Amino acid sequence: MAEVPIAVPVSIRDEVVPSRKRVKLPPWLEIAKPRLIPLLLATTLGGMALSESWPLPLPRLACTLGGGALAAAAAGVLNCLWEEQLDGQMQRTSGRALPSGRLSGSQAFLIAVALACGASLLLVAGVNCLAAGLSLLGLCSYVLLYTIVLKPRTTRNIVIGGVAGAIPPLVGAAAATGHVGLGGWWLFGLVMLWTPAHFWALALLLTDDYRSVGIPMLPVVKGPEVTGRAINRYAYATVAASLLGVLTLPSGGLFYGLMVLPFNGRLLQMAQRLGELPDDKQRAKGLFRWSILYLFGICLLLLLARTTMAADFSNQLISLLTLPPASAF
């Protein structure tokens, strides 16, 4: 008798990030959520690029990015520690180091303390106290405000809790000048507006998982249609806010303004397509992935805008736009 093949269910995590693209990490590194750190460091660089002091001396740049990475890792560990029981109940997270028993809670706590202390020492000694304080604020807001207070209680958890992910630009600005100027606050606001559309796209993929443990994410409470409309609104707000970078950049603003248009067009297109069919997992996955590339792209454009080439381009364009009209004969 022929053997009947048994279908093996694909995990929700593999649907979002296929396993062939993921590398198995040791448990002490896994709980630090290292895949989230590069985008946080990119926005830190963006905050620096918006200051008059860019480029920074290499030692200060290295200390800022190193301290930021350690602080973000500490926040990730504390998040995993607090949500250990919750993670064990969800398909996507049940294999994490703590719920699977590959790492103990006491070990995780010691790792978090070491990371937080390392971040503070590096930022205080190598950068300045304001950057260190803002980094600590980001850590606390992620763990206390978002993870403990907001996430289990309200559909607005990511709207308000997104402040944690928006603090790195302030750290970058503080590292560059010792204070936070208009550019740093602009990028902070942009990341705040970007976060809901990014995260709700992921939440549409993980609705069943969140529902099973009672986490009131917007798709769980309001449904996919309402979520799709909300994603559209925040996508438009993100695009509008992104254009203000033209005014906040010390140089190269027009270069940035032109180069950001294709990024904005693609973001709006994908948000609109998801709004039309909010139950479509492929569209939700596509927007989630593009939103990550979008924010990386914004930060890259900010860095490129501060180059001599971009500054010259912007100045020449301004000259062309301000030429007096030719005299009529």
From Swiss-Prot:
Pfam families: UbiA
Membrane topology, from the record: Multi-pass membrane protein
Highest taxon, organism lineage: Bacteria
Keyword list, A-Z: Cell inner membrane, Cell membrane, Heme biosynthesis, Membrane, Transferase, Transmembrane, Transmembrane helix
Main location: membrane
Molecular function via GO: protoheme IX farnesyltransferase activity
Pathway this chain belongs to: Porphyrin-containing compound metabolism; heme O biosynthesis; heme O from protoheme: step 1/1
Reactions performed catalytically: heme b + (2E,6E)-farnesyl diphosphate + H2O = Fe(II)-heme o + diphosphate
InterPro entries reported in the protein's UniProt record: Protohaem_IX_farnesylTrfase (IPR006369), UbiA_prenyltransferase (IPR000537), UbiA_prenylTrfase_CS (IPR030470), UbiA_sf (IPR044878)
GO cellular component labels: plasma membrane
GO BP, sorted A to Z: heme O biosynthetic process
EC number: 2.5.1.141
EC category name: transferase
UniProt-annotated location(s): Cell inner membrane
Sequence intervals crossing the membrane: 61-81, 108-128, 130-150, 158-178, 186-206, 243-263, 284-304
Family named by the database record: Belongs to the UbiA prenyltransferase family. Protoheme IX farnesyltransferase subfamily.
Note: Carbon 2 of the heme B porphyrin ring is defined according to the Fischer nomenclature.
Physiological role: Converts heme B (protoheme IX) to heme O by substitution of the vinyl group on carbon 2 of heme B porphyrin ring with a hydroxyethyl farnesyl side group.
Record-given protein name: Protoheme IX farnesyltransferase
